[in-house]
Amino acid sequence: MTLTQEFDTIAAISTPLGEGAIAIVRLSGTDALKIAQSVYKGKNLTQVASHTINYGHIFEEKRLVDEVMVSVMRAPKTFTREDIVEINTHGGIAVTQEILQLLLRNGARLAEPGEFTKRAFLNGRIDLAQAESVMDLIRAKTDKAANIAVKQLDGSLSKMINNIRQEILESLAQVEVNIDYPEYDDVETMTSQMLLEKTAHFEQLLENLLSTAKRGKILREGLKTAIIGRPNVGKSSLLNQLLREEKAIVTDIAGTTRDVITEFANIGGVPLELVDTAGIRETDDLVEAIGVERSKKALAEADLVLLVLDASNELTDKDLELLELSKNSNRIVLLNKTDLPEKIDSTQISGDFIRISALKNENLNAVEEKINQIFFAGEIEAKDATVLSNARHISIVEEALKALKEANSGLALGLPVDLIQVDVTRCWQLLGEITGEAAPDELITQLFSQFCLGK
């Protein structure tokens, strides 16, 4: 995107394309009001008060296109800090596309993906971490993932990072003064021991932040969960209960699920990417055999394994094989079909297990509790905590920590403070990439290109 494009007027459809009650076509830029007025009949939009909604009609010359409500928001109190117009039309592909084309013909440019949010960032309305949280909020699959995104949009992570960077900067400034003006007696000398204490403090702050990454990443991206078991033990029934809808075929015929079915479920605020695998068994059916191989691959890649056993039958060699195959995984063993007389010998199962009836939806809440225990130590969400959830942020904090550890190692070896300053400065610069203070232009462009059109 060139510099001249940054401040022209852009337009895009901000709601998903398709049939619906309402769609929104958004304009942002210096000429937003003038361009909207050129296709609108009603009150003069260039003269109405800011943050008002106005009733009128969109015309192509003399032909009526739609009856609309138009929101007018004047700079700088807008999302982009530019003039913004939002045209609320009747939902539908044809009418929204026609209105968008009218705006483009009258001087607007089609916005690039994420360009509205990018302008908010470039105009100082939000920082880079807050911009990324906008997309996290849009993509959140559970209320807890949304809560993390909202807190970051409100600036919780940015404030923490900025505070740490400020502390680091003050230490660096003191070192710099000592180096450049050694004759100054009124400035305290930063000794190796003093700097070691400070870098150890910074290291602890980042360690504490990084300790939230596992929980945050799971809540943001979900747990890849493989449902495995012999054919006809109730895997598809379990999938349907967890999804609260029928996605998999449930029959008494072994081998009904011949492929891998993937769906997302919200289990106590944790997004589970549920993979209902084909029953793992020996088979001559080529299609089913491919499904079995995919099942084994899903097991190897899973964050969580739900191993389903048929409690109404004795354990088979295949059951024992699956127990052995999954023993080193984050595994929950489920004894299904407890609505039938129990025949399974549970003493042959090492570790914990949960008795359930997928058919009757009995005791599935125990599965939720076990997931919480395995991945969150019983506390899925710490109130008011700043949580790292974005993979880019996690990687940066890890690199910043590495720089601090190198600084501490150098201090322990007796290296002079001015040499250690290089590693501490690198830590400060890396943390600036989270908020965008030190992010290269290429990174910023790449990040916003991942946004949806119209946001």
Curated annotation (Swiss-Prot):
PROSITE patterns: G_TRME
Binding-site residues, GTP: 232-237, 251-257, 276-279
Known cofactor(s): K(+)
Binding, (6S)-5-formyl-5,6,7,8-tetrahydrofolate: R26, E86, R125, K455
UniProt-listed GO biological process terms: tRNA methylation; tRNA wobble uridine modification
Gene Ontology CC terms, in alphabetical order: cytosol
An annotated Gene Ontology molecular function: GTPase activity
Enzyme's top EC category: hydrolase
E.C. number: 3.6.-.-
Stretches assigned to the TrmE-type G domain: 222-376
Keywords linked to the UniProt accession: Cytoplasm, GTP-binding, Hydrolase, Magnesium, Metal-binding, Nucleotide-binding, Potassium, tRNA processing
Binding-site residues, K(+): N232, T251, I253, T256
Pfam families for the chain: MMR_HSR1 (PF01926), MnmE_helical (PF12631), TrmE_N (PF10396)
InterPro entries the UniProt entry points to: G_TrmE (IPR031168), GTP-bd (IPR006073), GTP-bd_TrmE_N (IPR018948), GTPase_MnmE (IPR004520), MnmE_dom2 (IPR027368), MnmE_helical (IPR025867), P-loop_NTPase (IPR027417), Small_GTP-bd (IPR005225)
Keyword Protein transport: no
Cofactor note: Binds 1 potassium ion per subunit.
Amino-acid positions noted as binding Mg(2+) in the UniProt annotation, renumbered to this chain: S236, T257
Subcellular location: Cytoplasm
Quaternary data: Homodimer. Heterotetramer of two MnmE and two MnmG subunits.
Family, as annotated: Belongs to the TRAFAC class TrmE-Era-EngA-EngB-Septin-like GTPase superfamily. TrmE GTPase family.
NCBIfam families noted in UniProt: mnmE_trmE_thdF (TIGR00450), PRK05291.1-3 (NF003661), small_GTP (TIGR00231)
Role this protein plays: Exhibits a very high intrinsic GTPase hydrolysis rate. Involved in the addition of a carboxymethylaminomethyl (cmnm) group at the wobble position (U34) of certain tRNAs, forming tRNA-cmnm(5)s(2)U34.
Protein name from the UniProt record: tRNA modification GTPase MnmE
Species whose genome carries this gene: Lactococcus lactis subsp. lactis (strain IL1403) (Streptococcus lactis)
